[in-house]
């Protein structure tokens, strides 16, 4: 059996019982205290939900704006023409176009965190379904990424709006900021994220909806959160 390093031993000492349930603020403070990476680690939340996303009436998906932002520079591409294209550029879009943007993406240039389109451009965007779909980038009117108000959508994407979607096992993951953020900023983002998930509870969900909540950092341990400390828990 391999020997534990000093850092690993210190981690075990600080964590103690790995079955412990933490208050949200306590978990945030501990993960910041335990950070060891040279880069600015992300704070990540995971929620186990009482849903089976194989059933259409139990799908959980939507958008939420994190009040403290994400700490990431999100690249945004917009399919639009004319005044809408100019508005998207003015709002900070990284790439705006029509057929030319289609060809660029078909060539493999897909380094974007969000793709937005005006409704009249969906005939073009639809040809990218097999490319954008698997990456979760296909514009969707339900998520506000197919909209005539592209400027507002670009500002939202750049201003801390993130998408959430439940996975097969009923789990939702989300990055809610960087460990360099203040404790208060991270708590505000946590509350906003969880609140959005609670509000997105599908009609087909049976029994207890919010079953487990965990917090972790990019290189740190996962901490279980006391549901009594969580809004909607």
Swiss-Prot record:
Pfam families attached to this UniProt entry: Ribosomal_L1
UniProt cross-references to SUPFAM superfamilies, sorted A to Z: Ribosomal protein L1
GO cellular component, one term: cytosolic large ribosomal subunit
An example Gene Ontology biological process: translation
GO molecular function: rRNA binding; structural constituent of ribosome; tRNA binding
UniProt entry keywords in alphabetical sequence: Repressor, Ribonucleoprotein, Ribosomal protein, RNA-binding, rRNA-binding, Translation regulation, tRNA-binding
Family the entry assigns: Belongs to the universal ribosomal protein uL1 family.
Quaternary organization: Part of the 50S ribosomal subunit.
NCBIfam families: rplA_bact
Function: Binds directly to 23S rRNA. The L1 stalk is quite mobile in the ribosome, and is involved in E site tRNA release. Protein L1 is also a translational repressor protein, it controls the translation of the L11 operon by binding to its mRNA.
Entry-linked PANTHER family: 54S RIBOSOMAL PROTEIN L1, MITOCHONDRIAL, LARGE RIBOSOMAL SUBUNIT PROTEIN UL1M
Descriptive protein name: Large ribosomal subunit protein uL1
Organism: Novosphingobium aromaticivorans (strain ATCC 700278 / DSM 12444 / CCUG 56034 / CIP 105152 / NBRC 16084 / F199)
Gene: rplA
């Amino acid at each position: 059996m391999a020997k534990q390093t000093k850092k690993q031993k210190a981690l075990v000492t600080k964590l103690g019982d790995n079955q412990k349930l933490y208050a949200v603020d306590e978990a945030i403070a501990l993960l910041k205290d335990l950070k060891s990476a040279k880069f600015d680690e992300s704070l990540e939340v995971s929620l186990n939900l009482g849903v089976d996303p194989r059933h259409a009436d139990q799908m959980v998906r939507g958008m939420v704006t994190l009040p403290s932002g994400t700490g990431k520079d999100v690249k945004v591409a917009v399919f639009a023409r004319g005044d809408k294209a100019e508005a998207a550029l003015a709002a900070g879009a990284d790439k705006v176009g029509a057929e030319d943007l289609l060809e660029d993406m078909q060539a493999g240039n897909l380094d974007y965190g969000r793709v937005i389109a005006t409704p009249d451009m969906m005939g073009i965007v639809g040809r990218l379904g097999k490319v954008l779909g698997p990456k979760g980038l296909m514009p969707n009117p339900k998520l506000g990424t197919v909209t005539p108000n592209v400027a507002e959508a670009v500002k939202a994407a750049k201003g801390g709006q993130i998408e959430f979607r439940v996975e097969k096992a009923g789990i939702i993951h989300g990055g809610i900021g960087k460990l360099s953020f203040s404790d208060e900023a991270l708590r505000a983002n946590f509350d906003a994220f969880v609140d959005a998930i609670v509000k997105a509870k599908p009609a087909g969900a049976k029994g207890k909806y919010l079953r487990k909540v965990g917090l972790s950092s990019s290189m740190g341990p996962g901490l279980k959160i006391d549901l009594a400390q969580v809004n909607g828990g």
